[in-house]
């Protein structure tokens, strides 16, 4: 499941470029997985491709869209109109992926009423009191938290109380939710720390290799 969105993004890019077919080897390479793993993933969709031809790009993208629940637009409400919230509403890729930003909310009176996003489709920041009506009338199915850490749990609680069951959390905070609520956390600092760890490991391994090589030369001298 975690790899399907990656396949979907790559396929949509190729479809937009007019590409019609792709082999499992090409798609796997573009997505950073092995061809065997790709074929296994896609077999669960009932898609095996055509020998000698490969996969139909648009049809495979549609199959994955259906599996991910993207054949119908999903409404997204963002709480937090700071730099991150503004960047999210300005991103043009959501619509092509089946997501519509239906609200950008903030607690600060001086921010409410401002307009952000793409010039052709700007979004006006609303007050937090708009959250419940947006969820109640079915406009939003997913909530995004783009607030400071200290406000994240309270915002999450309010989203859940309003009826949202899917939350994407950008705040550097661990959220506690009742059973049946799915929270996905995006912590850029943690991801950078993981990369730094692997970079450090590579540097240490390289240093050890150089030491062994130097020792070998000394012994053979």
Question: Where are the predicted features?
Answer:
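Short secondary-structure boundary segments
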Residues: 147, 170-172
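Intrinsically disordered or compositionally simple regulatory linkers and C-terminal tails
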Residues: 204-212
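Short, Lys/Arg-enriched anionic-surface-contact patches
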Residues: 1-6
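Hydrophobic, well-ordered beta-alpha structural blocks that scaffold small-molecule cofactor pockets
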Residues: 9-19, 23-162, 178-192, 196-203, ...
């Amino acid at each position: 499941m975690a790899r399907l969105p990656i396949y979907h993004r790559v396929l949509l890019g190729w479809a937009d470029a007019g590409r019609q077919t792709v082999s499992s080897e090409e798609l796997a390479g573009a997505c950073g997985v092995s061809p065997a793993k790709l074929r296994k993933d896609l077999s669960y969709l009932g898609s095996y491709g055509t020998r000698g031809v490969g996969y139909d790009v648009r049809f495979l993208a549609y199959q994955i869209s259906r599996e991910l629940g993207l054949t119908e637009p999903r409404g997204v409400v963002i709480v937090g109109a700071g730099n991150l919230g503004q960047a999210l509403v300005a991103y043009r890729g959501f619509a092509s992926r089946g997501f519509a930003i239906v609200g950008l909310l903030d607690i600060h009176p001086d921010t409410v009423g401002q307009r952000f996003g793409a010039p052709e489709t700007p979004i006006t920041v609303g007050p937090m009191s708009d959250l419940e009506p947006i969820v109640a009338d079915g406009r939003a199915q997913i909530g995004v938290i783009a607030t400071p850490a200290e406000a994240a749990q309270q915002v999450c609680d309010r989203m859940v109380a309003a009826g949202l069951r899917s939350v994407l959390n950008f705040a550097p905070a661990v959220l506690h939710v009742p059973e049946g609520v799915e929270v996905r956390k995006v912590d850029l600092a943690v991801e950078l720390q993981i990369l730094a760890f692997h970079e450090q490991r590579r540097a240490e391994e390289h240093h050890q290799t150089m030491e062994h090589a130097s020792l070998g030369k000394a012994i053979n001298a």
